[in-house]
Amino acid sequence: MKKLLFLLAVIAFATCTTPEYKTLPMDEFEKAIAQPNVIVVDVRTPEEYAEGHIAGAINIDWKAGHFAEQAEVLLDKDKTIAVYCIHARRSKFAAEELMKMGYKNVIELQDGLEEWINAGKPIESAVEEVVYHQ
């Protein structure tokens, strides 16, 4: 009887865990983000983002302390959310947080943007427009 209760407890615990996000190698990530209904999120600081990011990515800074609040406003839970950072450290935390928040389809770039750049994949830089008022 104890074995049966233990087995039931293990099964119950296993079914209550948070679903996991997928970490994709660079080529698979590139194919995935080319699909419609995918939102690409750069979780680095705005300064890092401005230096260069994957085309079409929006910036939600993981370190800023309001990631969840910004994600709720900017991201659609019915779409695939593709996250990345420079070395795939912050993006892991961001992906886990998104899953906890109820996002069902979250993917993360394995090895981060540095490997993307080293492989010669395209990035774009944010160029600030300076307007002078007289």
Residue ranges and their predicted role:
Residues 40-42:
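Structural scaffold elements adjacent to functional motifs in cytosolic proteins
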Residues 4, 16-38, 47-80, 90-134:
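Rhodanese-like catalytic fold shared by cysteine-dependent sulfurtransferases
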Residues 84-85:
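Short, surface-exposed ligand- or partner-binding patches at beta-edge/loop junctions that are enriched
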Residues 1-13:
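Sec-dependent bacterial lipoprotein signal peptides
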Residues 11, 45-48:
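Intrinsically disordered, low-complexity boundary segments flanking structured domains
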